[in-house]
């Protein structure tokens, strides 16, 4: 199989990730639940991964990183734990349902939400967001990059303006963590939500959030914590406040190995390799008769995603043809991004997304282009 569905999850992982998970499953106990070696070893692995991620994102300290199962959980914790009736929150039409659905729930409870519009290429500039700031604006919640088009938002500019205005800035880094360098302090990010199984190259079931010192989030869950057993309330100190229950220690061990791999390989080297593959595919696909490509490719600031449609064919049918006729994996349909599809006019057709990893090759890209030419009936 040629795998071009890396924006959904990176299937090919570094060997060290697989080995770390295997070792953890054989030797890891439950962190914070005992003083025996297996429990202490788990605690050490979890702390070391917390510290590694803090360094990776330039967080103030390791305790500002809390682990979750994925970005969806992180975003629910942040959105539902920060805002209250009467608040005004600004978001965008680029968002995934993991942002939109929690916001829809808050709207029903009296939170006012404004969604910044995009241009014809699906791009949003900082001023498109910031123009909606008013005296009641409590937060800005936006993606770093669209999972549909790969278009990025200049979060450093948004963050600087938000910090100056005293507005909480929450960033969904699902598509960029591990792919694009992120410095939470330099970019003035108050809460960064990330998943481990995409660009970070870790196992599914891992994720987390960075919370800036001084930002208080109401916990979404309460329960076992391993500390303060006799208190009726869940501990309020980070990161325990946001980590009720047993953590995915096995997955976190794999995430540690994955982040180490990225740091050793160099995130800029990974980004360059993925960009080269994306442009190779884009430059070939745009010349195929009947292919319509979405997104802004006039800027270097984008994720390695090319989303397209072929004539008026249903995106699911095209993706099925690629999968069963050519063994090429892509993602069709709505991509959990309803507002973005409405903006692009692709609600009924959906779109076929090709997303690239540094583990892909130029030969695989060329094979996919040949397949598209055949499906388009426009062979050279």
Question: Which residues fall in each region the model found?
Answer:
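Pyridoxal 5′-phosphate
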Residues: 1-380
